[in-house]
C-alpha cells in the first residue's frame, strides 16, 4: 500500500529506526532519505537528501538513551526542515525523555521538562505526537498542539485476547501514584483494582501491603516506565505474599537500564509486556514480550495529516464478548 498524498513525508532518526520502519509500512509512506552523522568531538550533522518544501513532515525520534544525543539530533532535524521550507513539522516522540522532571521536588531544582518543551518549540516544531507521556501536565509546557496517545487500549486488547479479564483478574497499581492508570485498564478488562502501598516512605518501599484483595487472583501490575525494575519487583513480592495466583507486569516504555534484568529475574513474574517505544542495548529478562505501537502511531499520523480527530483511537467501548 502506498499512501496517495505525496505532501506527507516521514523521516526516521537514530533512536528507533525499527519502529519508524513499521510506521512507514502501516502508513504506506516511505521513509525519507537523510544522512545523520556524529563527528569525533560529538557534534551532530544532518543532511536531508530530498526536498521537503511545502511538505507536512513527521519526524520519528524517541528521546531515550543516550537521551541528550537523541534530543539534539531531533532539534537539529527540526531546524533543518524549517530552513528547507517545510509546511508543517510534526515530531513523533514515542518515549519523551525528561518528562519525569516536571516539577521542583526540592529547592533550587530546574523544571527540565519545560526547558525541553521550549527547545522543541523554538527549533520550529508545529505539533508533538507522543505515547503515554509520564506526566500529562507536561502537555501544558508546549505552546503547540500535543497529542498524547494512551497505551491502555493496546494492552487491554492483548490481555482480552489472552483470556486475562473478568473477575479472576485484578489490576494492581505498584505504587499509589498509578491508581488512575490501573483503573483505566481495569475498566477495559472488567476487573477490580488494588494498590500496593508502603508503611515507610515511597523512596525506601519497605513493609509493603495491598489495599484490596488479590488472594487467588491473576494480578496485572501496570506502570508507564520500566526503568530499574525495582518498582515491579517489590510489588510482585508484596502481591505474592498476599496470595496472588499469577503475576503479570505491563509498562508503556521498557527502558531496562543496566541491572534491571537481574532484579526482575529474582521475582515471580510470568510475563512482562512493553511496547517497542524504546530500543535498549542492556540485557532484558527472558519473560519480556514486546507489543508494537507502530500501527497505533501510524493511524494517529494519518489522522493528524488529514485533519481528523485522534481521540477515537483510544475511546473506551465496553467489549462485546
From Swiss-Prot:
Coiled coil: none annotated. One of its GO terms (molecular function) is kinase activity. It is an enzyme of class 2 (transferase). GO terms for biological process: 5-phosphoribose 1-diphosphate biosynthetic process; purine nucleotide biosynthetic process; ribonucleoside monophosphate biosynthetic process. Its cofactor is Mg(2+). Disulfide bonds: none annotated. D-ribose 5-phosphate binds at residues 223, 227-231. The keyword Phosphoprotein does not apply. This is Putative ribose-phosphate pyrophosphokinase 2. It comes from Lactococcus lactis subsp. lactis (strain IL1403). The lineage of its organism: Bacteria, Bacillati, Bacillota, Bacilli, Lactobacillales. The gene is prs2.
Amino acid at each position: 500500500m502506498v499512501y496517495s498524498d505525496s505532501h506527507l513525508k516521514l523521516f526516521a532518526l537514530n533512536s528507533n529506526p525499527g519502529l519508524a520502519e513499521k510506521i512507514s509500512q502501516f502508513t504506506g509512506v516511505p521513509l525519507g532519505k537523510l544522512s545523520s552523522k556524529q563527528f569525533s568531538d560529538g557534534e551532530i550533522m544532518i543532511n536531508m537528501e530530498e526536498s521537503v518544501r511545502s511538505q507536512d513532515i513527521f519526524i520519528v525520534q524517541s528521546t531515550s538513551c543516550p537521551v541528550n544525543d537523541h534530543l539534539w539530533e531531533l532539534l537539529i532535524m527540526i531546524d533543518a526542515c524549517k530552513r528547507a521550507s517545510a509546511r508543517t513539522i510534526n515530531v513523533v516522540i514515542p518515549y519523551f525523555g525528561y518528562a519525569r522532571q516536571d516539577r521542583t521536588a526540592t529547592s533550587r531544582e530546574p523544571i527540565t521538562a519545560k526547558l525541553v518543551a521550549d527547545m522543541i518549540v523554538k527549533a520550529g516544531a508545529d505539533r508533538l505526537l507522543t505515547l503515554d507521556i509520564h506526566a500529562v501536565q507536561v502537555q501544558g509546557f508546549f505552546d503547540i498542539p500535543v497529542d498524547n496517545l494512551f497505551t491502555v487500549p493496546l494492552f487491554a486488547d492483548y490481555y482480552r485476547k489472552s483470556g486475562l479479564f473478568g473477575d479472576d483478574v485484578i489490576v494492581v497499581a505498584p505504587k499509589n501514584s498509578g491508581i488512575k492508570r490501573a483503573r483505566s485498564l481495569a475498566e477495559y478488562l472488567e476487573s477490580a483494582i488494588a494498590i500496593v502501598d508502603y508503611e515507610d516512605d515511597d523512596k525506601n518501599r519497605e513493609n509493603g501491603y495491598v489495599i484490596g484483595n488479590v488472594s487467588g487472583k491473576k494480578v496485572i501490575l501496570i506502570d508507564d516506565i520500566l526503568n530499574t525494575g525495582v518498582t515491579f519487583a517489590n510489588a510482585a513480592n508484596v502481591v505474592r505474599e498476599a496470595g496472588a495466583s499469577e503475576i503479570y507486569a505491563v509498562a508503556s516504555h521498557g527502558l531496562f537500564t543496566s541491572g534491571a534484568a537481574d532484579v526482575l529475574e529474582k521475582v515471580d513474574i510470568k510475563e512482562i509486556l512493553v511496547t517497542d517505544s524504546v530500543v535498549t542495548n542492556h540485557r532484558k529478562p527472558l519473560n519480556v514480550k514486546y507489543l508494537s505501537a507502530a500501527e497505533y502511531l501510524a493511524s494517529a499520523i494519518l489522522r493528524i495529516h488529514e485533519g481528523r480527530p485522534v481521540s477515537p483511537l483510544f475511546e473506551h467501548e465496553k467489549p462485546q464478548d
